[in-house]
């Protein structure tokens, strides 16, 4: 019914063109009242004051509802756009965190490998060279001492093998710390040869002594 009345009023207004109402700077309530007066003035017997007030309130409520709906739509659009922006950011953060975890592990492995390369590899390269030198010196000693007793050769072997095994044992026992290694240049004291042991001193007549018979 109200819509029918409003359509009739609009048709009447279009049929009677007048000068436009200057409503710049006026509030919404004043504009609604002016519009109602403009439409209702030609039909005072149809619309009373109560009808005019009801129509004005209805128009005001409809305008406020329209504004509220527009505001809600704008808020929903903003929330959707903000959620779309937040989701890629969270996905990128998760991807970065997943990449950081293995990178830390690989860094730890690389540090360990660098330590092993720094401390172990030079010593592992030195040990075979030292062994070759000692073998060469041992062979020369064997050729030089062919006419001498085998005591000197046995002493050379007794000095060579414990020293070589001791160095390899140290490398296996402490793989990641250079301060545990005994310097390779250290020389252990040679064992005294049997020829250097002083002979016991005794009297020449010790072999001719006679034991008394009881």
Curated annotation (Swiss-Prot):
<protein>
    <recommendedName>
        <fullName>Alpha-S1-casein</fullName>
    </recommendedName>
</protein>
<feature type="repeat">
    <location>
        <begin position="125"/>
        <end position="140"/>
    </location>
</feature>
<feature type="repeat">
    <location>
        <begin position="85"/>
        <end position="99"/>
    </location>
</feature>
<dbReference type="Pfam" id="PF00363">
    <property type="entry name" value="Casein"/>
</dbReference>
<dbReference type="GO" id="GO:0005615">
    <property type="term" value="C:extracellular space"/>
</dbReference>
<comment type="similarity">
    <text>Belongs to the alpha-casein family.</text>
</comment>
<keyword id="KW-0677">Repeat</keyword>
<dbReference type="InterPro" id="IPR001588">
    <property type="entry name" value="Casein"/>
</dbReference>
<dbReference type="GO" id="GO:1903494">
    <property type="term" value="P:response to dehydroepiandrosterone"/>
</dbReference>
<dbReference type="InterPro" id="IPR031305">
    <property type="entry name" value="Casein_CS"/>
</dbReference>
<feature type="modified residue" description="Phosphoserine">
    <location>
        <position position="81"/>
    </location>
</feature>
<keyword id="KW-0732">Signal</keyword>
<keyword id="KW-0964">Secreted</keyword>
<feature type="signal peptide">
    <location>
        <begin position="1"/>
        <end position="15"/>
    </location>
</feature>
<feature type="modified residue" description="Phosphoserine">
    <location>
        <position position="83"/>
    </location>
</feature>
<dbReference type="GO" id="GO:1903496">
    <property type="term" value="P:response to 11-deoxycorticosterone"/>
</dbReference>
<keyword id="KW-0494">Milk protein</keyword>
<dbReference type="InterPro" id="IPR026999">
    <property type="entry name" value="Alpha-s1_casein"/>
</dbReference>
<feature type="modified residue" description="Phosphoserine">
    <location>
        <position position="79"/>
    </location>
</feature>
<feature type="modified residue" description="Phosphoserine">
    <location>
        <position position="90"/>
    </location>
</feature>
<dbReference type="GO" id="GO:0032355">
    <property type="term" value="P:response to estradiol"/>
</dbReference>
<keyword id="KW-0597">Phosphoprotein</keyword>
<feature type="modified residue" description="Phosphoserine">
    <location>
        <position position="82"/>
    </location>
</feature>
<feature type="modified residue" description="Phosphoserine">
    <location>
        <position position="63"/>
    </location>
</feature>
<comment type="function">
    <text>Important role in the capacity of milk to transport calcium phosphate.</text>
</comment>
<dbReference type="GO" id="GO:0032570">
    <property type="term" value="P:response to progesterone"/>
</dbReference>
């Amino acid at each position: 019914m109200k819509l029918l009345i409003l359509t009739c009023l609009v048709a009447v207004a279009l049929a009677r063109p007048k000068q436009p109402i200057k409503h710049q700077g006026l509030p919404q309530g004043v504009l609604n009242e002016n519009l109602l007066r403009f439409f209702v003035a030609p039909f005072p017997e149809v619309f009373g004051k109560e009808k005019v007030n009801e129509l004005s309130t209805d128009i005001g409520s409809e305008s406020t509802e329209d504004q509220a709906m527009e505001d809600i739509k704008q808020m929903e659009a903003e929330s959707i756009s903000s959620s779309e922006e937040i989701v890629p950011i969270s996905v990128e953060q998760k991807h970065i965190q997943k990449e950081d975890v293995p990178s830390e592990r690989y860094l730890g492995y690389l540090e360990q490998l660098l330590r092993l390369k720094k401390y172990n590899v030079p010593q592992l390269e030195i040990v075979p060279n030292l062994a070759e030198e000692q073998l060469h010196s041992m062979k020369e000693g064997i050729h030089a001492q062919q006419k001498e007793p085998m005591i000197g050769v046995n002493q050379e072997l007794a000095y060579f093998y414990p020293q070589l095994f001791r160095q390899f044992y140290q490398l296996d026992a402490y793989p990641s710390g250079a301060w545990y290694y005994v310097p390779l240049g250290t020389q252990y004291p040679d064992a005294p040869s049997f020829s250097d042991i002083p002979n016991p001193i005794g009297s020449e007549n010790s072999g001719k002594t006679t034991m008394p018979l009881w």
